[in-house]
Amino acid sequence: MKLLTLNTHSLIEPDYEAKREIFVKFIAAEQPKVFALQEVNQTAAAPLLGDAPAGYYPCPGNRVPLKADNHAAAVARMLEERGVHYYWSWLPAKVGYDIYDEGAAVFSRAPITAAENLLLSKTNDYSNWKTRRTLGVCAGDVWYYTVHMGWWKDEEEPFAAQWETLSQAAGAKQTAFLLGDFNSEADVRGEGYDLILRSGWQDTYRLAQQRDDGYTVVQAIDGWRDAPDAAAKKRIDQIWCSRTVAVKSSRVVFGGLQEPQVSDHAGVLIEL
C-alpha cells in the first residue's frame, strides 16, 4: 500500500487552482491508501459550503463549519468527479495569516470508523498562531495521524511537550502512522528527530529498501526564515510508524523533478 504526506499550503500558494489540479491528478493516478495534508485552509469569511462532498467524516470537537473554498473539500470533490472515492476528515487548529481557518486533513480509501482531535500545544487559543492540533483517523485497524508540529527551540510551545502528548495518544494504538510536517530536521542530532527515535517510533524513510535524499524543503520558508540554516535543505516532512514495517520505497514527490512543485514543501510517498 502507498501512504503520502504533503504540507499543501493550499489557498496561500500562488497559482493555487493550477497546482491543486496537478495534485489531484497525481492522487487519482497513484491512489494511495491514505494521504495526509497539513496547512489545509479555507477563508474564514467565505460562505458556508452546504452539503459536504461524499465520504466526509466530521471530527469530534470541531465547531468550525466547512466553507465554500475549503481545500480538503475541493480535493475530495475533484477526486469524486474522476471516479476516485476517498473518505476524509478535516480539523482546523487556528487562524492562519489573519484570514484563514487553518488545519489538517486525512483521506482514506477505506471507511473511517473513528476520529481523534488532539490538542498538542499548551494554548487552546484559536487566534494564536502557535496553537497545534492533530487529527487522527482509524481506517481498518490502523490509525493515521496528520501532524504539524512546533519547533524544538520554541520556549513557549516546545516540540518536546507536544511530542509527549502525541506519542502517548498514538502510541496507545495497536498500529499507528504519523504523517506530516514535524518541523524537526532529520540531520540535526539531539533535537526532535532523535526524540522520536528514542521514543521507539520507526522512520519509514530509514526502513525503505529504496529511497532518495528525502529532502522536502530546499529554500527558506515561513517558520524557518530566522534560523541560521534557513536556506539549507531539510528533511522535515516524515512518515513514522509505531512498529517496524517492511517499506519497499520512500521518495520525494512534488519536488520539481518528477512532479511539479505545488507547495513550499515537497511531499513524501512511501510504498509498503
Show the residue positions of the predicted features.
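Short, flexible/disordered intra-domain loops and linkers
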Residues: 13-15, 44-68
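Active-site regions of metal-assisted phosphoester/phosphodiester hydrolases
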Residues: 1-34, 58, 80-81, 85-272
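Alpha-helix-centered segments that form part of catalytic cores
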Residues: 66-86
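Short, conserved active-site loops that position catalytic residues or coordinate cofactors/metal ions
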Residues: 8, 30-53
